[in-house]
């Protein structure tokens, strides 16, 4: 399937390219996130000393960006292709250019530019040195050297590549409206467009996000997720010595839920400027605590013997 002919072909080509490089090809995280960076395969795995290479597609939701399906390239639900490489390889820029070639974009025939644009995620307590990747005057990707995630310095530094799949596909296919993208690579009666798959959802979720989401319920959902995250973080320590944490991932799930509730409240227009900053700081504190807990797990770099303390023997329950 030629990547320049279909949205799904583009995804398959990127998966194949990064799999050949040695990345674990993961599936999307099964929660509402605002960007591919929120997937624990990036946010948490970027922390600690262990090497990690992964790539995945992540559906991302930014409720505030919905336009009822009337804008040709602005969506409240869209797709990112995320690559995380730890430690960051010295030739990451060359790897990126080769990935473009794999989807039919020859850097010798197109004007590829890297525009400095340092990245920051206030809710994740994360930042990094970064560049936007422009192709013939249009931004199609971003790559970042993570310096800090969840308030923790990254050592080693991880390299992150984020492809905006819809925008990249529009460029490759030469269309000006996202809903006109060929999704399955077929022609005639068998052709399925991006609009066939997602236009109705864009209209309905825009209506939901801006007009009908229940603000009182969302405020309560935020409080519940915040409380659950704090509860799991406190309960996850194996002992009073706090040497190993056994529930970093369930706690982080609740952090993600709090973040999504905040994004919906923000789209609904029920949070003042002052309150908005307060909510961002509350989510950031959850993310920082989850990151600290992750560093006390085996995957986060804690020694296996330490991380297993407090676990029940197989076949038994605590």
UniProtKB/Swiss-Prot annotation:
Cell location: Cytoplasm
Residue spans of biased composition, Polar residues class: 300-309
Keyword list, A-Z: Aminoacyl-tRNA synthetase, ATP-binding, Cytoplasm, Ligase, Nucleotide-binding, Protein biosynthesis
A GO BP annotation: glycyl-tRNA aminoacylation
Molecular function GO terms recorded: ATP binding; glycine-tRNA ligase activity
Signal peptide: none
Catalysed reaction, written as an equation: tRNA(Gly) + glycine + ATP = glycyl-tRNA(Gly) + AMP + diphosphate
Location of region: Disordered: 298-318
Family (UniProt): Belongs to the class-II aminoacyl-tRNA synthetase family.
Description of how the protein assembles with itself and partners: Tetramer of two alpha and two beta subunits.
Descriptive protein name: Glycine--tRNA ligase alpha subunit
Organism: Rhodopseudomonas palustris (strain BisB18)
């Amino acid at each position: 399937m030629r990547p320049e002919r279909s949205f799904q072909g583009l995804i398959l080509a990127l998966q194949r390219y990064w799999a050949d490089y040695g990345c674990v090809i993961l599936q999307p995280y099964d929660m509402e996130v605002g960007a591919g960076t929120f997937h624990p395969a990036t946010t948490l795995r970027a922390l600690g000393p262990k090497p990690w290479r992964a790539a995945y597609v992540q559906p991302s939701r930014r409720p505030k960006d919905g336009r009822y399906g009337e804008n040709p390239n602005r969506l409240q639900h869209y797709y990112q292709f995320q690559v995380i490489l730890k430690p960051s390889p010295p030739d990451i820029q060359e790897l990126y250019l080769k990935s473009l070639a794999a989807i039919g974009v020859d850097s010798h025939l197109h004007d590829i530019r890297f525009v400095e644009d340092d990245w920051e995620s206030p809710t994740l307590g994360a930042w990094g040195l970064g560049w936007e990747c422009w192709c013939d005057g249009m931004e199609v990707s971003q790559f970042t050297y993570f310096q800090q995630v969840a308030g923790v310095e990254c050592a080693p530094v991880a390299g992150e590549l984020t492809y905006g799949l819809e925008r990249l596909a529009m460029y490759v296919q030469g269309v000006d409206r996202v809903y006109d993208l060929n999704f399955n690579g077929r022609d005639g009666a068998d052709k399925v467009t991006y609009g066939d798959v997602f236009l109705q959802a864009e209209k309905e979720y825009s209506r939901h996000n801006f007009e009908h989401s229940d603000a009182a319920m969302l405020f309560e959902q935020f409080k519940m997720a915040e409380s659950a995250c704090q509860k799991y973080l406190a309960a996850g320590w194996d002992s009073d010595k706090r040497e190993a944490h056994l529930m970093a991932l369930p706690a982080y799930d609740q952090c993600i839920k709090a973040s999504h509730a905040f994004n919906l409240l923000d789209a609904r227009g029920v949070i003042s400027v002052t309150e908005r900053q307060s909510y961002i700081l509350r989510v950031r504190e959850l993310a920082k605590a989850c990151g600290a807990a992750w560093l006390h797990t085996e995957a986060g770099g804690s020694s296996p013997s330490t991380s297993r303390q407090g676990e029940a023997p197989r076949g038994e329950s605590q």
